[in-house]
Amino acid sequence: MSDSNKKTCNDAKQPILVLDLVRLVLERLSFVDFHRARCVSSVWYSASKSCIGGTNPTAPWIILFPNEHVKTNNDSCKSIDPRDHSSYTIRDLGFDMVRSRCLASSGSWFLMLDHKTDFHLLNLFTRERIPLPSLESIDGLQMKFVRTGDCGFEMSMYYKAHGLISYGKNSDLRISDAVLWVDEKNGDYFVVWFHHSTFAYHKKGGDNNSWKVFQPSKHQGCINMVFKEGKLYVLNPARNISVFDFSGGHSPVEYATPPSPNDDYYVRNLAVTLSGEVLIISSNPKKCFVKLYKIDPKSSEWRLIKSIGDEALILDLGITVAAKDGVMRNCIYFSHHELLRYKGVSLCNDDKYGICIYHIKTKKKVQEFEHLTTSSPILFKDARWFFPTFGGN
């Protein structure tokens, strides 16, 4: 190369050109290949951060959590794209997935409770982990936890009628329900969990690094809850729904809705539609039936419905989404029944729904995943539907 040619070559621009080329390659990859490729080197990882994110799947995926009785890498799990049945083993998470429980999800973020009873937010694709306040850090007198060892704790509850009651040592905190919301564009998050008549919540940028406690006015407990657009919807054992508005930034404001059908014992879930309507869902894992109710705007009473139109219900997320780009119309996406999940029962054949897509009008399964529960021993303890996302898209 001549001296003149050497002078026209600007070495300072070479890293930029490399990033541009890598970015062009990344933007043409599928979601799975995209996340594999971004781990090739620091250059590829840097380029992936500036990708617009056209690789995000438009239909929900299934995430599978490994069973402790199966020989596997403790820090891995498996995801499945149901449209083509392609699977992806997510390895080297740096987190003990076997001895941890997933409580909720938002995009690619998962609320995890580990074997030491510590809460974490875990992004399965970026491997990013955010530790949440410990159980001891609870702002309020209603609930108190004291560590008694590496995994154990002692819990005390304060009741107005009975005063302080201690429940002794425990090593297994059974969170009956939880919700998670994450804004992947700016990193904001909001977490709520319920245990023993008390709700605890925490959000990024709060006043302190602790869980704030609140209780519904009627202390009726919780069997399911959903968080959407700043509001927490709580279904209690009496089949009534309370709504807590967190948009004010301070203590939540409570609202009430008409009582749900109290003649239906199997009401276990609620959901919020795209238009903001509240649905309640009745189902039984031992029997093949599903009922959906919503409030009649004229009578303000709950009525049975047989269609949700051009939407699909993702039961794990408690929301409906538009039925397009691979999402099946007028269907419910089932995974692992919450009663079995709460009791720690692994995926099994006794669940008549199991992991499936169920058509509301025909009352038939339009897609099943029996191979995930027919192996012996069962390979997975839990499954959830989720929407993989990266970069806030």
Swiss-Prot record:
Effect of inactivating the gene: Abolished brassinosteroid (BR)-induced ASK7/BIN2/SK21 degradation, and BR-insensitivity. Suppression of the constitutive BR-response phenotype in the dominant mutant bzr1-1D, and accumulation of phosphorylated BZR1.
Any matching Pfam family: Beta-prop_KIB1-4
Compartments in which it is found: Cytoplasm; Nucleus, Nucleolus
GO BP annotation list: brassinosteroid mediated signaling pathway; positive regulation of brassinosteroid mediated signaling pathway; ubiquitin-dependent protein catabolic process
Domain of life: Eukaryota
One of the record's GO cellular component terms: nucleolus
Main localization of the protein described in the UniProt heading: cytoplasm
Domain F-box: 12-59
SUPFAM superfamilies noted in UniProt: 3-carboxy-cis,cis-mucoante lactonizing enzyme
Keywords of this entry: Brassinosteroid signaling pathway, Cytoplasm, Nucleus, Ubl conjugation pathway
Function: Component of SCF(ASK-cullin-F-box) E3 ubiquitin ligase complexes, which may mediate the ubiquitination and subsequent proteasomal degradation of target proteins. Required for brassinosteroid (BR) signal transduction. Mediates ASK7/BIN2/SK21 inactivation both by competing with substrate binding (e.g. BZR1) and by promoting its ubiquitination and subsequent proteasomal degradation.
Protein's name according to its UniProt entry: F-box protein KIB4
The gene coding this protein: KIB4
